[in-house]
Every structure is written in C-alpha cells, then in structure tokens.
Amino acid sequence: MEKLAFGGGCHWCTEGVFQALRGVEKVDQGFVQSDAPADTWAEGVIVTFDPSVIQLATLSEVHLRTHSATRARSPRSKYRSAIYIFEDRQRHEAELAIAGFAHESGDAVHTVVLPFRS
C-alpha cells in the first residue's frame, strides 16, 4: 500500500470522490500541512491505495478534475490546491500528471506538489 494526500476544497466532498475508486483502501479526511509557506493547516484527505490496482497518476488526475485546480490560491489557504507526497519518488509522477492536465486544459494549473508533514 502507498499513501498520497490531496487538498483543494472541502475535505468532506473530496473524501467521497476517492472512496468510490477501485484500488483505494482507505480515505482519512481532516487537515494536512507541509513546509513553509504551506505550513499552515489546510483541509485535505489522505488516500491509502494499492498501486497494482490504481496508479498515482490516475489518483492525481481524478484530483485535478474534481476541484478548481486552475484557480489561484494562497499557499497558506485553508483550501490549498496540492498533492502531498509521502516519498520523494512520488514527486515526478505527480508533476507529470499536473503538466498533462495543464496541457490538455490549456489553462494554468495552480496545484502544487508538496511533501506531507502532518
């Protein structure tokens, strides 16, 4: 099992999106934080998933398509748009998903990849 966390809107709404996906074992909702300037608490969900069933790229794409990823927000916002990684090796795949979504949508995407701290 692997973990990722996602933020971008109300954690109650985000929780249901990920719970419906095959390969997602558990979704915990609450507040997450990263390093400065994103070190304030923001609403988010922690997703535990089986990478042999659902890939990190798929989870990232679902996240980008189900909240306002193209809306600029403060990094200190309660609704910070982010993909929080638990391992450094997850960064590249998450960044590729964001770049692909930006290319497809033709819009600037304001979702950032951040290390999960708590």
Locations of the language-model features?
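Flexible coil/turn and secondary-structure edge motifs
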Residues: M1-S118
